A protein has these predicted regions:
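Extracellular lectin-like interaction modules
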Residues: 1-243
């Protein structure tokens, strides 16, 4: 706990039950992994403060099914280079800050398996540029719910790339929720010769809270949505040929 100071972390292994780190900036390089060492407390990871990816980073509580919480912004050291992998089993994942809002991160996977819920405050900002450069995979067919509680979710292809954005949750019910206001999900090409990522909401119906209009756009990438429902009279705009 460094309060307003900076904290630098490399690997933390499986002989730790809980990890809680607080700092003005938390620099992470490597894997933080918890173990199920307590009968009363599922091993979790809490990062309180802004996080910088100094290398490829994995946060893993899969063996303990513990929660993963990151309260601040998450940025890469070099745009589109450092990757992020999250695995929490049945534990909840919550990103309270914007991902890639200042410096875009690389390929990102959040819960390729497990039923844990996922909450994301934002990917990028109002600028028309991808905040995750590469492949983005959020959830899987067992994910109990995904909540987008911000307004901007913007990904991008690297120059010459053909990466994808895939959001997946259980196919039962309206389990992909937009709750933070009028939201935009968008993808952008890396240059004039590169289309934006294909965007796929593969399973799980999108639910739009009252007055939470939704815009989905791409620079030519295909867009596929399994289903959308609104709570009142929300507006949905889908455009796959924005340039």
């Amino acid at each position: 706990n460094a309060a307003a100071g900076n904290v630098t972390i490399e690997d933390i292994g499986t002989d730790v039950n809980d990890v809680a780190i607080t700092g003005g900036t938390i620099s992470v390089d490597g894997t933080i992994e918890t173990a199920d060492l307590s009968t009363s407390d599922a091993g979790g990871i809490t990062l309180t403060g802004a996080v910088t990816l100094a290398g490829n980073v994995t946060l893993d509580t899969d063996s303990s099914n513990g929660p993963i919480s990151v309260t601040g912004a998450v940025d890469a050291t070099n745009s589109g280079t450092q990757t992020l992998t999250i695995s929490s089993g049945s534990g909840a994942v919550d990103f309270g800050g914007v991902i890639g809002g200042t410096t875009a991160i690389g390929d990102t996977t959040i819960n390729a398996s497990g039923s844990g819920t996922i909450a994301l405050a934002g990917i990028g900002d109002a600028n028309d540029v991808g905040a995750i450069i590469g492949t983005t995979a959020i959830g899987n067919t067992s994910t109990a719910g995904i909540t987008f509680d911000g307004t901007n979710y913007k990904c991008g292809n690297p120059a010459g790339g053909s990466d994808t954005v895939t959001i997946t949750a259980t196919g039962t019910g309206q389990v992909i929720d937009f709750t933070g206001g009028a939201a935009t999900v968008a993808s952008f090409g890396g240059n004039a010769a590169t289309t934006g990522n294909a965007i796929t909401f593969s399973t799980g119906t999108i639910d739009l809270d009252n007055a939470n209009n939704l815009t989905i756009t791409s620079d030519g990438g295909a867009i596929s949505v399994a289903g959308i429902r609104g709570d009142s009279s929300e507006t949905v705009t889908i455009t796959a040929n924005v340039t």
